[in-house]
A protein has these predicted regions:
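A short "linker-to-beta-strand initiation" element
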Residues: 9-27
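Cysteine-dependent PTP/DSP-like catalytic domain, specifically the C-terminal lobe
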Residues: 134-157
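Short, small-residue-biased leader/transition segments that mark boundaries at the very start
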Residues: 1-8
Length: 157
């Protein structure tokens, strides 16, 4: 029994769960697989944004994966750059300015976010939504999957 149900019992208000039906909507995020990323390398149809810290992106250090570096052509936007001094996301206006500068005229809809394992990319994805730049993609396999797939190109610097 949970602490919450114990409180209800003491108050004489035993909760009675009722069956519910939930209808799931289609995913709000476009999930991209390794083969799609590879097929679109260098294409204007895809703008990769890597959310890892700059030393990992540049290949100066790699504590987790067998190869250091990044997917060729990727831009670097460490996820922590989205957070203001108060610990919350920066304002929509600031995020829009920063991402627009990073994209340098590229279509925001072409963006596919990634990181080391797909987790740290999400703050960048959310930041672009907050900025009003629209829905973007997520390559959840990220650097871990890319660097562990034989034959895929890797870049450093």
């Amino acid at each position: 029994s949970s602490a919450a149900s114990d409180v209800y019992k003491r108050q004489g208000e035993e909760p009675s769960p009722a069956p519910r039906t939930y209808v799931l909507s289609s995913p709000k995020v476009r999930l991209v697989q390794t083969e799609e990323v590879r097929a679109q390398l260098g294409s204007a149809q895809q703008t990769l944004i890597d959310a890892r810290a700059e030393p990992r992106f540049k290949g100066e250090v790699e504590p987790l994966d067998p190869i250091a570096g990044h997917i060729p052509g990727a831009l670097n936007r460490p996820f922590a750059h989205n957070i203001a001094a108060d610990g919350c996301f920066k304002s929509a206006e600031v995020l829009k300015q920063e991402f627009s500068a990073l994209l340098a005229g590229r279509d925001p809809a072409s963006v596919v976010h990634h990181c080391g394992s797909g987790v740290s990319a999400v703050p960048n994805l959310l930041a672009m939504e907050i900025a009003g730049l629209g829905s973007t993609g997520l390559y959840a396999g990220s650097w871990s999957e890319w660097s562990n797939t034989p034959g895929l190109p890797c870049a450093r610097g």
